[in-house]
Curated annotation (Swiss-Prot):
Its EC number is 2.3.2.27. Residues 149-227, 241-261 are annotated as: Disordered. Belongs to the RING-type zinc finger family. ATL subfamily. It is found in: Membrane. This is RING-H2 finger protein ATL58. The keyword Zinc-finger applies. The lineage of its organism: Eukaryota, Viridiplantae, Streptophyta, Embryophyta, Tracheophyta. The RING-type zinc finger domain mediates binding to an E2 ubiquitin-conjugating enzyme. One of its GO terms (biological process) is protein ubiquitination. Keywords: Membrane, Metal-binding, Transferase, Transmembrane, Transmembrane helix, Ubl conjugation pathway, Zinc, Zinc-finger. It is a single-pass membrane protein. The gene is ATL58.
Amino acid sequence: MSYSNSNPENYSAATSSPELKLYQAFIFSVPICFTFIILFLFYLIYLRRSSSDLSSLGMRTTFIPGNSLSTIELGLSKELREMLPIVVFKESFTVMDSQCSVCLGDYQPNDKLQQIPVCKHTFHMDCIDLWLTSHTTCPLCRLALIPSRSRQSQDDPVPSLVSPDEEVSSQPESEPVNHRVVSTQPESEPVNHSGVSSQPESQPVVNHRGVSSQPESQPVNHINDGHEQQCDQDVEGFKEMEEDERNNIGTSSACCSCRTG
């Protein structure tokens, strides 16, 4: 009986030991899983807060007109940030704002503030320095501290569309003047039978290049033979008239001498 009773006890102990181990493992795994879940939730909360802080500081992308790509707005350089005037806040000191627009904290006596000269707004030195590292505008009124590129492009003169090489002068090109003046003397023309030399009627014309152009030699028109014969006849007739007058004078003088004798 004892042998038969011991066998079921050993069998129950052998079968119960794996179940016990599984139960113990389940008990230990539950808190571990719970711990991982809590850590994961904390991590999500941390990421959400960090993203909200970045958005509150203005780390956002802005679209530039005329460009489809979004770029992060760049801030002022360190030299420009240090050039902002520093004022000390006092209770009797009147400022436009009594609260920093970046951290939303009230100004305390003897606080060092930096003032934007354009709009006269004041902020904590650390707050405005952090803001201007990623912005170029006032945190309160959004006034640009640096003129935008579009405004600068409007102020710039319009470039010439025509390159200097392609510019055409409106004045006509002056033709080169030939300083050499060529004077051509007219050839000696033959003298006609009447003893009168025929001279050219037109004078040489000087063109704009300084070269004198002579008229073409015209053929000399000689007196025709009929005209020459007529002249000879006139001369002979004149001589005959003189001889007749002389003869008449001689005969008249002879008659007078005869009458007197």
